[in-house]
Every structure is written in C-alpha cells, then in structure tokens.
Regions:
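Short, glycine-biased loop/turn motifs at secondary-structure junctions and
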Residues: 1-273
C-alpha cells in the first residue's frame, strides 16, 4: 500500500534492487560487490552489462563497475591483467549455477590475497590441474600402449618445468620449447617459451593467454572424444544430440579447470600485513 504522507519512503520501497555502477576500490570491496550481485540475482553471462526492468545486471568482471567492459578495464588492485583475461572464459562457459559459485570462490581468494596474485599461480594451475586433466583424458582414449606412454611422458616433462618454476627455479627458453612443442598443439610454443624464460610481467601476460587457450583446447578435445564415445561409454539423456553431449562435457571440463585455478589461488600465500 502506498503512503501518501511519505512518498520518498514509498519510492525507496518499490525501487528495484540493482548493481552500483561506481568502480570498486579494492579486492575486498570487489568480493562484497560480487556477493551482493549473486544474492540479488544480478549476474549474467555472455554480456558485460545489461539493464532489465530498471535493474543493472553484469557479468563476473562487469560487477566491478559500470566502466568495466573488458579485461583491460579491470583495476590492477583487484587482480592482475593476466587473470582478468581468464575470467570470462571460465564464467561464461560454465553452467549458470556453477559459474556463479565459481565467481564467489574466485573473489573470496582475491580478497584474501588483497589482489596481489603471484604469477606462480599459473605454474601451479598448469601442473596440478591442466596437465593432470590432459593426462587423464589421454588415458581414457584408445591409444596403443607405446603411443600412450610417449604422450604421458611428454606431459610429465612439461609438468616438471612448471613445478621447477613454482619452486623458485628457472628453465632456459630451449627447455620450454622442447617440452611445449609436442604438448601444446593449439598454442604458440615459441611465444609461450619466451615468456616462461623471461621475468617480465608483460611477457607473463602473453604467456597466460597461450596457457588458457591451450587449456580450453584440451577441454574441447576431451569433450569431442567423449561425445564420440571414443574414450568411454557415453550415456546420453533422452533427446540429447551429440552436440548437446559435447557442450555438456565441455562445460564440465571448464568447471574442473576453473576450480583448479581457484585451488591454485588458495595455495598462494597471503601478502604480509
């Protein structure tokens, strides 16, 4: 019921819940903003911002502010550029409920780290999630024993380099090239090797672009094999086509890799007070 004696109060009561459009100041505020969006049904996928019935909606990065329309607009104090570039690929490709839960877990870790995310997270993620996933996918396929052993050995060689960097060591460019070429069939091994052998932050940003692209290719290749029933028995829901099955498997793979990234963030030490 309206209150003619207090129109301002009535207006406040009927105003739609919406997202603030001002830019968040730090990673803790970013977590609070994302949680607010989640709790009030203001998150969307595959679009940066959207207005609906007077409400401002946004994606996992768009919630940071109305001016955030791409990874390059993400403030550095929230997360590094290389991580911002990865977020849409995970958030937009998971099932909605999985994406929303993943985003909350991501921002929780960013708040804990105060936005100071070391690049070692990528080495951790590659060694413990991406390459582990790919090794498992290879083992489910119909390779002859010798071919499978060769492929798994190549995965282990590359994983050892990631672990070496994670533990504070370093490997020369040639070592990265030799390990990457047989594994990263979908990425530019030379460019990735240059970045991994270089301590420059901009090179690292480029390296991550290749790392994510290849992780996505692995997820897609595994989904293809799954949909073709080449690797294992593949139950389909009633009326589900091969394309449907592949899309479902791809979303599951992306979730697995995205969860692995959050787990790697959780293992990164918090900055000193």
């Amino acid at each position: 019921m309206t209150d003619p004696q207090n129109p301002a109060q009535d207006s406040a009561m009927t105003a739609p819940v919406t997202l603030p459009t001002d830019l968040v100041a730090d990673a803790v505020e970013a977590y609070d903003r994302y949680r607010y969006a989640l709790e009030n049904g203001l998150l969307i996928q595959n679009s940066w911002h959207q207005e609906l019935d007077g409400r401002q909606l946004a994606c996992a990065l768009g919630v940071l502010g109305g001016a955030v329309n791409g990874p390059n607009d993400c403030p550095a104090q929230i997360m590094p550029r290389w991580l911002a570039r990865m977020v849409p690929g995970f958030f937009d490709r998971m099932a909605p409920a999985d994406a929303q839960a993943w985003g909350l877990a991501l921002y929780e870790q960013l708040a804990r780290l105060k936005g100071q995310v070391p690049f070692s997270v990528v080495y951790d993620w590659q060694a413990t999630a991406v390459l582990e996933f790919w090794a498992g996918s290879l083992q489910r396929r119909k390779f002859d024993p010798e071919t499978l052993a060769t492929k798994l050995a190549q995965v282990e060689t590359l994983r050892a380099l990631h672990r070496k960097h994670l533990e504070g060591g370093a490997a020369p460019r040639d070592a990265w090239c030799e390990a990457l070429r047989p594994i990263y069939a979908y990425a530019d091994a030379d460019a990735y090797a240059d970045a991994d052998a270089d301590a420059d932050a901009y090179a690292y940003a480029d390296a991550d672009a290749y790392a994510y692209a290849d992780a996505d290719a692995y997820a897609d290749a595994d989904a293809d094999a799954y949909a073709d029933a080449d690797a294992e028995p593949t139950p389909r829901a009633e009326g589900e086509t091969r394309a449907d099955l592949k899309a479902r498997r791809k979303a599951e793979n992306i979730k697995l890799l995205g969860d692995g990234l959050v787990a790697a963030l959780a293992r990164a030490p918090a900055p000193q007070a």
